[in-house]
């Protein structure tokens, strides 16, 4: 089991699943860099720690209880909640991150947010999630929404500058974006969202 300093950031808890992903990757590799990543958030994290189970040996009940599942070039695991509930909340660093975001609205149907660099000590996953939320709020959605980070698929997480292009909305509550490196597709990000 890993006890990590998970805390809620800002008023919403949507970014915590990205912090869990970065923590798991750091436990595996000593950094958040990997390849062929598919990370699916099954429900929001509410605990200060997690434990990992190999999916191949997991029971059906454990599959249902997992807060996320992660597959990459070396692992296929369930991320299980563990430890005490998260009780601490801090200011969100989104405002500082936004200084590194620029928008391209040339195609109003599929606007793009460009991220020029990762903030110091801000992992890729959290930056990616914050950038997609900013894109949705700035260029796509006209009403206040509560978002939940739902899925991240990437060929590589060894990324410092990237873009996210809005792709589509499913059923008015599910949002898809394409992650681009130098204009070439590298992955996808998905959010769930409901009217605030």
What spans do the regions from the language model cover?
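Hydrophobic beta-strand-centered segment that forms part of the acyl-chain substrate-binding groove
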Residues: 25-61, 66-68, 129-168, 172, ...
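HotDog/MaoC-like acyl-thioester-processing domains
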Residues: 45-101, 167-196
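N-terminal ordered "arm"
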Residues: 1-41
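Catalytic strand-loop segment that frames the active site of acyl-thioester-processing enzymes
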Residues: 1-14, 83-125, 135
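Short amphipathic alpha-helical face segments that pack within enzyme cores
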Residues: 19-26, 121-130
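Generic serine detector
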Residues: 2-4, 31-32, 57, 111, ...
């Amino acid at each position: 089991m890993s006890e990590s300093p998970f805390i809620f950031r800002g008023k919403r808890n949507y970014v915590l699943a990205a912090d869990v992903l970065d923590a798991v990757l750091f436990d595996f590799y000593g950094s958040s860099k990997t390849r062929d990543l598919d990370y699916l958030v099954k429900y929001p994290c509410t605990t200060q720690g997690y434990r990992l189970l190999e999916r191949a040996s997991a029971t059906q009940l454990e599959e249902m209880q997992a807060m996320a599942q992660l597959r990459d070039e070396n692992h296929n695991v369930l991320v299980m909640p563990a430890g005490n509930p998260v009780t601490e909340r801090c200011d969100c660093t989104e405002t500082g991150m936004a200084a590194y975001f620029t928008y391209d609205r040339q195609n109003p149907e599929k606007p793009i947010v460009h991220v020029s660099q990762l903030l110091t000590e801000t992992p890729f996953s959290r930056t990616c999630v914050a950038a997609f939320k900013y894109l949705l709020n700035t260029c796509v959605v006209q009403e206040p929404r509560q978002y939940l980070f739902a899925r991240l698929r990437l060929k590589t997480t060894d990324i410092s500058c990237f873009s996210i292009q809005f792709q589509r909305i499913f059923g008015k509550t599910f949002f898809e974006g394409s992650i681009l490196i130098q204009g070439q597709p590298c992955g996808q990000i998905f959010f769930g969202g409901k009217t605030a």
